[in-house]
Each structure stands twice: as structure tokens, then as C-alpha cells.
């Protein structure tokens, strides 16, 4: 079957009438070295990359699926956990949880089982790509909102904090911006049959921009790169730099009680954790954006490299693994969510005559608390 006779932004153009396959590479996310004698998906390099990708996807499904479910369940059950920072973290948890249980199984089948061949139809192809893109932007925007919230709470403690209505508006804004910006990833996603080697076809699933839309694609990518990576990283870096100056290099006037010192240690621990998360975010996503820039704006640098497709998927895998770091840091380190979850399970299976006392002691009411309540370090008694 002859592929479409058009140049694309995410797949190469094949011209079937010719005796041999002619490639006109452009700005591709999933360009396959077509028409070569050797199937790149059968090489040892791709086999090793497939193992790495499979392990990473399995880790994402396990860590993000279970970890974020535990956090969401604990947050819904215990009002003590519901402060503004945790409400923002909940956005990360929800988006990563959806990716872990919805996207990753299909990606495991696409990358590892079928080795870059899609078998689930156009609707699921577009939906999986769209949901994964929305999750990335939600995570980025939520991390940015958390950094700004910490900045206002620590550097400007006397200014009024956000109330519940403002926090709800901010959370809605995080999702609306992410959903709207990611629309092109769904609109331009399609299935395309590509001939990798002679008489061997694979069904490509990804974004395809026609040759006359390359300028729009470049503009869109640069817009997203600035709005969802450079801008947030610079803003978060400035926020945490100013917070660090406030917590470590500013003398606290007056006598410091044990409670004040404990609060300061708590805030320092939280900020160190958040700076570590920012560092992990940059280390995971910078290679992905860097590779994409080189591939889309300087295509001759990579298209001649035999294993550049394998390299791209490994880079993409590293980027996706950032969700595991977020889950481990936010869910298990910061809030001791597992302790709350274990308490919840013990309470659920405890005999009924102990139920009322346990509920009162553990503060299990599901009514909300003010979004301005600050709990930097939560510990069970």
C-alpha cells in the first residue's frame, strides 16, 4: 500500500511511483529511516532501547498509578491534608494517574510489543497523544503555581494568601490553559502506513503537519517551548532563589522559640524538595526539547544518523519518567501519604464499635478547609 504523497512535519514523504523510495525529511517527531535494507526496529540498539522504554513505562504505571491513587484517596479522606499546596499537587497527581492507567498501556503496546506500529484506531491514537500532552502541561503549570505560592507565603508572609475561591479559579485555569494549548496535538494526530523495509509496513501514530503548515508548526512549537518550558523554568528558578535568600541568608529578628526554629526547618526542607523537583524537571525535559529543536530546525544533523529514532524514543522515555520523580517526592516524601492511607485501611477494616472514636481521633471529615491553611510538614501523632 502506498503511503500518502505529501511531506509532513512528523513523518517523511514517500513517492510511490518511483522505483525506489525517495525521502524528503522535514520536521518530524517520529521519522523512520524508510526504504533501508535493515529494519531499524530489529537492531540490537533498538532492542536495548525497547527494554529501557518497557522498564520505564512499567515503572510509570506502577509508581504513578498506585502512588497518585493513594495520594488522591488520602486527600479526599483527610481534611488535614487539604492545604493550598496539596490542592495544587493534586492536579499533578490526577494528570499523572490518568497517563499511567490510560496512556502507558497503549504506549507499551506501541513501543515495545508491536515495535512502533499502532493497532487501536484513530480515535485512541489521537486521545492518547492528547491526554499525554495535557498531562505534561498540567504538571508544568501546577509546579509553577506551587513555586509562586511558596514565594508569596515565605517572602511576603504579611500579604493576604489565596482563599478557596481564588485557589479554585487557579486550578481551573491550570487545566483550561493546558487543555487549550494541547488541542493541536489531537487535531494533527493521525494514523499513517509507513513502509520501513521492503514489503514491511507499520502503522504510525503521531502528529502529521503538511508541508504548507511547517511555518505554523514551528511557530506553535516555539510558542509552547517558551510558554510551557522556558518561562516556567525561569520563573520557578527566580522564585526559589529568592526563597533561599529569605530562608538561609536573612537573619531572623528577636528571640527564636523552638516552634519558630521547627517551622524554619520545615520550610527549608520543603523548599529543598521543591528545588530538587525543579532540577529533575529540567534534567528530564531539557533533552527532549533540545532534541526536538535540533530535529525540527536543523534536520540534516539527525536524519543521516541510523539510530536517531532510537535515541529520540529514549529521550522521550527519560522525559516521561519525570512523572515518577514527582510522585515519589510529593506523595511519599512530603506528606507521608502512605501513613495516612494505612490508617485509612486499618480504620476501614476495624470493627464497627471502634469506628466513631477512630473517626474523631483521625479527623476524617471530608469537608474542606481554608485553602490558606499552611502545612509544610505533616506528621502523624
UniProtKB/Swiss-Prot annotation:
Keyword Isomerase: no
Protein name: Prokineticin receptor 2
Cellular component aspect of the GO annotation: plasma membrane
Protein family according to the UniProt entry: Belongs to the G-protein coupled receptor 1 family.
Bilayer topology: Multi-pass membrane protein
Residue ranges annotated as Extracellular topological domain: 1-51, 108-133, 190-220, 292-310
Gene: Prokr2
Tissue spec: Expressed in several regions of the brain, including paraventricular hypothalamic nucleus, dorsal medial hypothalamic nucleus, paratenial thalamic nuclei, paracentral thalamic nucleus, lateral habenular nucleus, lateral septal nucleus, lateral globus pallidus and amygdala. Highest expression seen in paraventricular thalamic nuclei and is also extensively expressed in the suprachiasmatic nucleus.
Amino acid at each position: 500500500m502506498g503511503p500518502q504523497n505529501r511531506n509532513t512535519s512528523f513523518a517523511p514523504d514517500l513517492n510511490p511511483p518511483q522505483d525506489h523510495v525517495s525521502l524528503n525529511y522535514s520536521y518530524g517527531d517520529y521519522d523512520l529511516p524508510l526504504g533501508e535494507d535493515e529494519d531499524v526496529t530489529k537492531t540490537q540498539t533498538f532492542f536495548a532501547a525497547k527494554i529501557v522504554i518497557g522498564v520505564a513505562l512499567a515503572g510509570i504505571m506502577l509508581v504513578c498509578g498506585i502512588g497518585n491513587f493513594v495520594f488522591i484517596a488520602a486527600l479526599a479522606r483527610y481534611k488535614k491534608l487539604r492545604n493550598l499546596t496539596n490542592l495544587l499537587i493534586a492536579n499533578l497527581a490526577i494528570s499523572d494517574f490518568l497517563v499511567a492507567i490510560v496512556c502507558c498501556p497503549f504506549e507499551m503496546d506501541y513501543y515495545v510489543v508491536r515495535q512502533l506500529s499502532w493497532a487501536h484506531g484513530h480515535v485512541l491514537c489521537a486521545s492518547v497523544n492528547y491526554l499525554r500532552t495535557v498531562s505534561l502541561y498540567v504538571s508544568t503549570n501546577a509546579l509553577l503555581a506551587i513555586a509562586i505560592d511558596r514565594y508569596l507565603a515565605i517572602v511576603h508572609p504579611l500579604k493576604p494568601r489565596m482563599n478557596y475561591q481564588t485557589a479554585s479559579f487557579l486550578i481551573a485555569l491550570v487545566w483550561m490553559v493546558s487543555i487549550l494549548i494541547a488541542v493541536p496535538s489531537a487535531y494533527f494526530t493521525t494514523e499513517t502506513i509507513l513502509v520501513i523495509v521492503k514489503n514491511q509496513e507499520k502503522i504510525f501514530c503521531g502528529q502529521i503537519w503538511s508541508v504548507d503548515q511547517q511555518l505554523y508548526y514551528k511557530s506553535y512549537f516555539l510558542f509552547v517551548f517558551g510558554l510551557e518550558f522556558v518561562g516556567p523554568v525561569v520563573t520557578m528558578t527566580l522564585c526559589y532563589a529568592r526563597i533561599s535568600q529569605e530562608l538561609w541568608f536573612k537573619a531572623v529578628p528577636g528571640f527564636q522559640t523552638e516552634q519558630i526554629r521547627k517551622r524554619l526547618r520545615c520550610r527549608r526542607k520543603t523548599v529543598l524538595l521543591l528545588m530538587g523537583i525543579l532540577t529533575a524537571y529540567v534534567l528530564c525535559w531539557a533533552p527532549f526539547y533540545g532534541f526536538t529543536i535540533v530535529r525540527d530546525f536543523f534536520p540534516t544533523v539527525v536524519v543521516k544518523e541510523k539510530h536517531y529514532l532510537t535515541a529520540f524514543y529514549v529521550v522521550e522515555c527519560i522525559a516521561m519518567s519525570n512523572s515518577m520523580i514527582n510522585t515519589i517526592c510529593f506523595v511519599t516524601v512530603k506528606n507521608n501519604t502512605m501513613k495516612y492511607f494505612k490508617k485509612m485501611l486499618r480504620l476501614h477494616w476495624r470493627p464497627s464499635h471502634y469506628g466513631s472514636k477512630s473517626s474523631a481521633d483521625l479527623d476524617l471529615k471530608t469537608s474542606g478547609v481554608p485553602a490558606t491553611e499552611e502545612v509544610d510538614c505533616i506528621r502523624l501523632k
